[in-house]
Amino acid sequence: TILQLYNFDAIVVEPAGALSMSALDDYKDKIKGKNVVCIVSGSNNDITRMEEIKERSLLYEGLKHYFIVRFPQRAGALQNFVSNVLGPHDDITYFEYRKKTQREKGPAVIGIELQHPEDFKGLLTRMEEQGIKYIYLNDNPNLFEFLV
């Protein structure tokens, strides 16, 4: 909601100020056909926090997903991932890789932004079809905060 207000209406609000609008999604069936007023308040928000707010919003909406992926340590491994795993509108927004010596595979932390939440299942299916082993970080808050 905060991002929508900012992106579409150039309104900067603090998280508490957008709470009433966020609640509309949860109550949409109960308030259908009724007149509803939402009070949007507070611009007590540091604009430098917008990136953090955007990140949390994308995670909440199911549009951003983080993984630890074990990549083969050979030329073209990332290109293979991009070509055969990512959908046409998927985007790698975070990538951290460390080459390991004397090993066939090395771990990479990857952040992938999807255009629609329903694209997630297809992403996982393509990873499995390509034999890619991964750890999903969004459901593991301790590891997520440590790595991302």
Segments (PLM) and residue ranges:
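Active-site-adjacent helical/loop segments in soluble small-molecule enzymes
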Residues: 1-34
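A short, charged, Gly/Pro-tolerant segment at domain boundaries
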Residues: 18-19, 38-44, 142-146
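Catalytic phosphate/nucleotide-handling subdomain of diverse soluble enzymes
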Residues: 25-55
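A conserved regulatory-domain signal marking ACT and ACT-like small-molecule sensing domains
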Residues: 47-148
